[in-house]
Swiss-Prot record:
GO biological process, one term: pantothenate biosynthetic process
Compartments, as annotated in UniProt: Cytoplasm
Keyword terms: Autocatalytic cleavage, Cytoplasm, Decarboxylase, Lyase, Pantothenate biosynthesis, Pyruvate, Schiff base, Zymogen
Cofactor annotation comment: Binds 1 pyruvoyl group covalently per subunit.
Protein name: Aspartate 1-decarboxylase
Binding site for substrate: T57, G73, A74, A75
Post-translational modification note: Is synthesized initially as an inactive proenzyme, which is activated by self-cleavage at a specific serine bond to produce a beta-subunit with a hydroxyl group at its C-terminus and an alpha-subunit with a pyruvoyl group at its N-terminus.
UniProt source species: Mycolicibacterium vanbaalenii (strain DSM 7251 / JCM 13017 / BCRC 16820 / KCTC 9966 / NRRL B-24157 / PYR-1) (Mycobacterium vanbaalenii)
Amino acid sequence: MFRTMLKSKIHRATVTQADLHYVGSVTVDADLMDAADLIEGEQVTIVDIENGARLVTYVITGERGSGVIGINGAAAHLVHPGDLVILIAYGTMEDAEARAYRPRVVFVDADNRPIDLGVDPAYVPPDAGELLSPR
């Protein structure tokens, strides 16, 4: 049996731009892509913390060190600059691999620079303010 599991996520990133007239996708700073083990063209789900919008798209590589999280195409109707979002990538794996797999969890600061890397999808860094862990 195959299971679809959380592969990686970038938690509470700030959207820096939105371009309705682009062909689609989300532009992500190359440093964040590396931290979250994302590659260009990989499918991601974007969850907008501000309004609850949830959408599926693919990643394109943004300028390294820029902090860019750019929403492109029709998704710009749902997600806007300044919104906090979670980018989630899933992977399909055999049951045994899924049970041992540790996802990459990336927390970022207000400028979308990685500040904490982990493997626990429910982990909350000590300096995360009002965020609560479900554990």
